[in-house]
């Protein structure tokens, strides 16, 4: 067992990745005002412009969590009405490229900031847990959403990605669903940088 754990890859890119808090916002949401929210928006836009201009950054994603942050989950229904508990990890299309997480079926569409739609991606473990063998005809809906609106339809699964270990290897693979949108705000920036350029990135 120890040897297996030492030699098991987590299933995602671990080299030349930096996780840094860059916005430093107060967690006391009651202190937020319209003016402070506008100021935050301006700071984030300026920060994005600086990151986009950095020649040592390959990709970045702002978030409230990194790839190893413990996630929460909820019950989803498949096309037979069967209930399955899935972990939820909010992501953008850049997340999968940043960590070299392989798409094994389907395609993760490019979603720009003007297009506010969200699509569903699952890992192999989630596809299996839902009772599907392919994304053809596969869809899901949150149990709570269906309970609130009996006429709500399933949302299609657009892609399946390779499994990876989200935490300790002994915890195994977790069936995970990824609501994928254009951008998710957060103080934590996950940055993939050019190999050998960490110092230059920090100095930038």
What is the role of each PLM region?
Residues 42, 46-204:
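Mid-to-C-terminal secondary-structure elements
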Residues 18-24, 188-190:
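Active-site-flanking beta-strand signature of metal-NTP-handling nucleotidyl enzymes
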Residues 1-16:
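Alpha-helical transmembrane segments
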Residues 27-40:
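Short, flexible/disordered intra-domain loops and linkers
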Residues 5, 23-25, 65, 160:
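Generic beta-structure capping elements
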Residues 15, 35, 72:
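A contiguous, well-structured "functional interface" segment within a domain
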């Amino acid at each position: 067992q120890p040897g297996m754990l030492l030699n098991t890859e987590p299933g995602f890119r671990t080299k030349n990745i930096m996780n840094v808090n860059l916005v430093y916002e107060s967690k006391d949401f009651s202190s937020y005002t319209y003016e402070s929210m506008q100021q935050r928006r301006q700071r984030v836009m300026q920060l994005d412009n600086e990151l986009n201009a950095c020649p040592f950054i390959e990709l970045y994603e702002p978030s409230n969590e990194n790839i190893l942050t413990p996630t929460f989950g909820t019950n989803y229904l498949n096309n037979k009405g069967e209930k399955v508990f899935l972990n939820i990890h909010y992501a953008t299309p850049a997340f999968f490229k940043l960590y070299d997480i392989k798409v094994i079926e389907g395609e993760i569409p490019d979603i720009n900031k003007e297009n506010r739609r969200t699509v569903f991606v699952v890992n192999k473990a989630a596809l299996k847990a839902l009772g599907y063998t392919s994304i053809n005809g596969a869809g899901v809906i949150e149990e709570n959403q269906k309970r609130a609106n009996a006429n709500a339809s399933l949302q299609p699964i657009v892609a399946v990605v390779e499994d990876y270990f989200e935490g300790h290897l002994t915890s195994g693979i977790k069936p995970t669903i990824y609501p994928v949108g254009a951008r998710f705000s957060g103080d934590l920036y996950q940055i993939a940088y050019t190999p050998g350029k960490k110092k230059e990135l920090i100095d930038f």
